[in-house]
């Protein structure tokens, strides 16, 4: 009885304690807290968290966002992984496409690399172009056109080597420039080969030259030298390039045939436009009244008699420095024979070729040419009477 009473008392205390404490009842048929209505075990996540284990404020929202993000497929998830694999496949396809494009580009560049530069020098290329032309001469543009058509390597690299062709044409003596004819319009001069440079290649092979060809003297310098030497009279004709090319040497007189090889001809030195005076005016305006008639008679007699005049002693005393001073020995001194070589020879030649025009000019300058010679010889000209007596006018 006591035990039962005590037991009833304890059951009553237990019932009071159960009523005083709030118990969260999940369901009526729950026999155990860890099982649901079907008797299955609950997951620990479905149980509510105790108050002391509750998270900080805002943590459920973050957890909900994480769960929602976990449910949605993305690039980093397995579904996304499969997509990434597809992307990788696309990358592989792109890589394969890029490799095909690179192979195609390599195939296109392969013909360019297969073009090998010809083993000929620029001089050999220019020589080929000139020799194949019908006229054996070409302009710079014609030479470049031949090289481009003949060799594909130079066709693709055309602008780069044109200056090299121009420099080789100008700097090598084996190429000669020919000016363009007046009736042949166009641009640029012609270029041809020097005739002496035909054997500069070994056995006609353009791969190797024997030696560098050098011209001894350029043709235009020879022509200029010939023109310059012709202005020096007979001595210019005796030079190594004194006569133009194409004329025989006998066309010009030898300087030894001249009477005075050390005196050039006076004819070209005389002024052609010398004023000509009438004979009467010339006699009045002579340097000396007594010398005017004598010079005229002497020139007229020299034109018929010869080129050398031999003078004889006259009855009158000779004109000399001793006669002016008054010495007696000068009056009795015999006069020597005098030959008037240079002045009279020049005068006689001029009178024979141009009797009218140059005779007056020579008469005007004859005292200047003859007086110094006669003074040195010690005798002056003879009087007119002695000249007429010895050589009468014919």
From Swiss-Prot:
An example of a Gene Ontology cellular component annotation for this protein is: nucleoplasm
Keyword terms, alphabetized: Activator, Developmental protein, DNA-binding, Nucleus, Repressor, Transcription, Transcription regulation
Q: Which residues bind DNA?
A: 117-211
Record carries keyword Repressor:
yes
Q: Where in the cell is it found?
A: Nucleus
In residue numbers, the region (Disordered) covers 1-99
Single GO BP term: anatomical structure morphogenesis
Which stretches does UniProt call biased (Acidic residues)? 19-31
Q: Which InterPro entries match?
A: FH_FOXD3, Fork_head_dom, FOX_domain-containing, TF_fork_head_CS_1, TF_fork_head_CS_2, WH-like_DNA-bd_sf, WH_DNA-bd_sf
Biased-composition ranges, Gly residues, are 77-99
> Which PROSITE patterns is this protein grouped with?
FORK_HEAD_1 (PS00657), FORK_HEAD_2 (PS00658), FORK_HEAD_3 (PS50039)
Quote the biased-composition stretches of kind Basic and acidic residues, using this chain's numbering: 32-41
Q: Does the keyword DNA-binding apply?
A: yes
Which Pfam families does the UniProt entry name for this protein?
Forkhead
GO MF assignments: DNA-binding transcription factor activity; DNA-binding transcription factor activity, RNA polymerase II-specific; RNA polymerase II cis-regulatory region sequence-specific DNA binding
Domain of life of the organism in this record? Eukaryota
Role noted for this protein: Binds to the consensus sequence 5'-A[AT]T[AG]TTTGTTT-3' and acts as a transcriptional repressor. Also acts as a transcriptional activator. Promotes development of neural crest cells from neural tube progenitors. Restricts neural progenitor cells to the neural crest lineage while suppressing interneuron differentiation. Required for maintenance of pluripotent cells in the pre-implantation and peri-implantation stages of embryogenesis.
PANTHER family in UniProt = FORKHEAD BOX PROTEIN (PTHR11829), FORKHEAD BOX PROTEIN D4-LIKE 1 (PTHR11829:SF361)
Q: What is this protein called?
A: Forkhead box protein D3
